[in-house]
């Protein structure tokens, strides 16, 4: 389950559940909160590479300082510690968020660091399943989700003039290999310089709409340099365009999201025989839940990304159009109180097993996730 983080004064990032953070310090205009969760999580699947313990902990700090009547400073850091490896092994722990910024009253906020890309302002509408949510994109994938080197300006209620009209402008610096930037990374996590924008409007009666786009340069390795001559999906630019609609009222939540992207939807891994980016991809997500008064929240979701015109791989095969992600998600969460919950999340995989999925390492088996969560 993804913890929706609240960037102080940046409400596009959401907090999951109803648990509040623990206040560490609050004096003379300075505040510091600690938040987090522990998820005792197990996967059940016939795929041995997925089946087993998936437990983890997330925790973070967020703070603010009142500089003047109209100027507030803020910052946030969040970390994930995986709990399913031996103590003498690399647990692959990592920082999810880390940024600092300034809020200028009704004139908006500006921050820089590791944060969320503007396309997630739309994707957040459907990214709500307790475990298998937001599967049509991933971290460090241009400006789809969490990424590094993001400078973000956000404005809520359009300078205080139009209630419910919010927008964001974003720039991302280059994150290349070790020879191009100081934070070298795998080819499927790289990006060139890019920019994006999002806009949302709360129309009242529980109805909201949002749209976003990004345009980024791609790196030389993403176009076949330095031993990546077999990577698929060449192109100078990566682009994404997304729109979403949601209804959230009377204990009912309904949302849909559609994204069209070019040279940006990734598949495989750099050590698989088939990997790279779809020349064109269409992603669709839908999600619905009902919240009962006694704590039960049943839900249903659907995720699909269709890669179009994938082209010829390094193994000489032309793969044409392929499903990169396609599944129905069913389950329920039960909230004991604001700090404790449990859930079952059943991913019914609709991707057909074929030569492409085998070569790209795409799982085609069903997965059941069972979790017990404490959050604060």
Curated annotation (Swiss-Prot):
Places the protein is found: Cell outer membrane
Example of a GO MF term: porin activity
What family, per the record? Belongs to the Gram-negative porin family.
Kindly give the membrane topology term recorded for this protein: Multi-pass membrane protein
Which is one Gene Ontology cellular component term of this protein?
cell outer membrane
What is the species listed in this Swiss-Prot or TrEMBL entry? Serratia marcescens
Gene3D superfamilies (alphabetical): Porin
Give the signal peptide, or none.
1-21
According to the record's subunit comment, the protein's assembly and interactions are:
Homotrimer.
Listed A to Z, the keywords are: Cell outer membrane, Ion transport, Membrane, Porin, Signal, Transmembrane, Transmembrane beta strand, Transport
Tell me, what is an example of a GO biological process annotation in this record? monoatomic ion transmembrane transport
Q: What is this protein called?
A: Outer membrane porin C
């Amino acid at each position: 389950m993804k913890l929706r983080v609240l960037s102080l004064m940046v409400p596009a990032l959401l907090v999951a559940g109803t648990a509040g953070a623990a206040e560490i310090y609050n004096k003379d205009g300075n505040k510091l909160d600690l938040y987090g969760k522990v998820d005792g999580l197990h996967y059940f699947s016939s795929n041995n590479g997925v089946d087993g313990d998936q437990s983890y902990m997330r925790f973070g700090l967020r703070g603010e300082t009142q500089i003047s009547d109209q100027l507030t400073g803020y910052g946030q850091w969040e970390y994930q510690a995986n709990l399913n490896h031996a103590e003498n092994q690399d647990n692959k722990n990592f920082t999810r968020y880390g940024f600092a910024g300034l809020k200028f009253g009704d004139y908006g906020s500006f921050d820089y660091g590791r944060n969320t890309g503007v396309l997630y302002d739309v994707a957040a509408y459907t990214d709500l399943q307790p475990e298998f949510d937001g599967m049509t994109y991933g971290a460090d994938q241009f400006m789809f989700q969490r990424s590094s080197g993001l400078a973000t300006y956000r404005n809520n209620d359009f300078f205080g003039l139009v209630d419910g009209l919010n927008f964001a402008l974003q720039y991302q610096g280059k994150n290349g290999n070790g020879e191009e930037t100081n934070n070298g990374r795998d080819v499927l996590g790289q990006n060139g310089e890019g920019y994006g924008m999002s806009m949302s409007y709360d129309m009242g009666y529980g109805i909201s709409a949002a749209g976003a786009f990004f345009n980024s340069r791609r790196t030389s390795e993403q176009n076949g340099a330095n031993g990546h001559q077999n990577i698929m999906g060449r192109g100078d630019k990566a682009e994404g365009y997304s729109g979403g609609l949601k209804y959230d009222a009377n204990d009912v939540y309904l949302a849909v999201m559609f994204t069209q992207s070019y040279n940006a939807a990734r598949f495989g891994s750099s050590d698989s025989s088939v990997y790279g980016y779809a020349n064109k991809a269409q992603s669709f997500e839908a999600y619905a839940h009902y919240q009962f008064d006694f704590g039960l929240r049943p839900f249903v979701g659907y995720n699909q990304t269709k890669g179009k015109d994938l082209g010829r791989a390094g193994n000489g095969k032309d793969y044409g159009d392929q499903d990169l992600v396609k599944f129905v998600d069913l389950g329920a969460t039960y909230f004991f109180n604001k700090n404790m919950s449990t859930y079952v999340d059943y991913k019914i995989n609709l991707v057909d097993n074929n030569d492409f999925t085998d070569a790209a390492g795409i799982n085609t088996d069903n997965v059941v996730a069972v979790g017990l969560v404490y959050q604060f």
